């Protein structure tokens, strides 16, 4: 029995050291957190901009596209806008109806973004990078500013990480 425990302990130790070395020395993706977005690309019609951007992909799951839920008349800016940025492998539907209820309570326009690769096939997810998602965050913040004087951001999981990284950049806040 002692021999079995001894070998089990050694195996666990070797595995821990191996995984630790892999985590420290393993390959890492280069992440460019400086990715930005030119807000002038949004133009005067944000709905049209989002439709054109999302039309580039034929495999987006219905209902998870980038979009604005207008508090009142379409195209009318509100004092506050709410932006929802979802988590990894999720979509705008992740915590609904929470963003809708917050926006409704504030009388705010609501912007839903879709991070690159999300709401599509597994292959599309595999091609996305953290830099792509940082650009998506910059685009979403610009869109939220275009439809509201101030922006309330709701984010979950990876969305929260992206917003935290964006908060460190004066050009995005």
Where does each model-flagged region fall?
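Short, surface-exposed "cap/lid" segments of acyl-processing enzymes
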Residues: 61-115
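N-terminal membrane-anchoring alpha-helices
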Residues: 2-45
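Gly/Ala-rich beta-loop-alpha elbow adjacent to hydrolase catalytic centers
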Residues: 154-163
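Conserved hydrolase catalytic core segment
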Residues: 165-173
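N-terminal cap/lid segment of alpha/beta-hydrolase-fold proteins
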Residues: 36-77
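Loop/turn elements at helix/coil->beta-strand transitions in domains of secreted/extracellular proteins
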Residues: 108, 149-150, 172-173
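Catalytic nucleophile-loop/oxyanion-hole region of alpha/beta-hydrolase
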Residues: 120-147, 152
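Extracytoplasmic/secreted proteins, especially bacterial periplasmic and envelope-associated proteins
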Residues: 93-97, 132-139, 161
């Amino acid at each position: 029995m002692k021999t079995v425990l001894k070998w089990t302990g050694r195996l666990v130790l070797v595995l821990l050291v191996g995984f630790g070395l892999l985590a420290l020395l393993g390959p890492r993706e280069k992440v460019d957190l400086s990715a930005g977005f030119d807000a002038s690309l949004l133009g005067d019609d944000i709905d049209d901009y989002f439709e054109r951007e999302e039309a580039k992909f034929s495999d987006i799951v219905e209902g998870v596209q980038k979009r604005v839920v207008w508090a009142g008349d379409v195209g009318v800016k509100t004092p506050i806008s709410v932006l929802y940025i979802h988590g990894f492998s999720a979509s705008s539907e992740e915590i609904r109806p929470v963003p809708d209820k917050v926006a409704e309570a504030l009388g705010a326009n609501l912007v839903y973004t879709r991070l690159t690769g999300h709401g599509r096939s597994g292959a599309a997810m595999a091609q996305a990078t953290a830099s792509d998602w940082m650009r998506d965050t910059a685009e979403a913040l610009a869109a939220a500013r275009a439809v509201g004087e101030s922006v309330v951001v709701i984010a979950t999981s990876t969305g929260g990480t992206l917003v935290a990284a964006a908060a460190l950049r004066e050009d995005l806040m």
